[in-house]
Amino acid sequence: MDIKQSSEKQGRPHHLSDSRTVLKRNFILIPAYILLQSIVPIIVVFGSLGITAMITQQAPPQWLYHFSLSLSFVIAQGLILVIFYKMHQSEINDVVKQQWIVAKNKIIKIVIVAIVVYLLLLIIRVIGTSLPNHLSYHLTQYEQRTLGLFKSPYVLLVTFISMVFLRPMVEQIIYRYLIIHELGKVWNRQFVIGLSIFIETIVHVYDMASIFEILPYIVIASAATILYIKSRDNLIVAYIFQVILQCILFIEILSKYTNF
């Protein structure tokens, strides 16, 4: 008996919405996330720097800027997850348990995929540095922005929480659950899969300096999407993959680019 049949017999859905009806309320998460990612950093960063300057009568330390910026991302991402939880409060615990039953049996496969993807990223990086000057890049623009959150030891824990745990979950909800699972009820499945990968990629490379910066994010988005689809739209499987990969990337950045 497969997991979905077992879930139905127990009255527990394998997904948050197994019906063919699109839950339109879910899509408020997209503008809410964009809004929170824009407003919360302004409030937290300028608020903390302003209060510090007012109390000390001195310019705030540089680490405080990076800490408050990273903290603002955690707050924004956390708020989105709280909103999503409240929207599905009556069913989400059972769904997570059922999806975890499937996901824990695929851990080895997920780890292997994450390692293969990381090796592909290394190969792409080598190719990127060997291209002609107008096409080459060492770090993508997104990676350069991310490095700012590693400039102080005070920031690392908050950055780790955001980069490894919270952001990947928000991304699974938006790119996999909303776009593929929900929109897939009314639009062509192959189209929404391609749309999901395209949007996830563009969000990371909107300010790219080289067209080849797009390659790493296509690989990551494609791998997460394939795992999601192959596991019958299991968010936990895709999430675990992203957590493992982001943890590897976090350690790499920590070892290469930090010098406290």
Each predicted region: which residue ranges?
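Membrane-associated alpha-helix detector
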Residues: 33, 138-139, 144, 175-184
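Membrane-water interface at transmembrane helix exits
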Residues: 44-56, 84-89, 121, 125-133, ...
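Transmembrane helix-loop-helix hairpins at the membrane interface
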Residues: 153-260
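Juxtamembrane helix-loop-helix connectors linking adjacent transmembrane helices
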Residues: 54-64, 92-167
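Short alpha-helical segments used as structural interaction elements across diverse proteins
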Residues: 21-22, 122, 164, 173
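N-terminal, membrane-interfacial amphipathic/helix-forming hydrophobic leader that caps
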Residues: 1-110, 119, 210, 247-260
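Short acidic/polar alpha-helix capping motifs at helix-coil junctions
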Residues: 33, 143-147, 189-191, 201
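Generic alpha-helical transmembrane segments of integral inner-membrane proteins
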Residues: 35, 39, 43, 75-82, ...
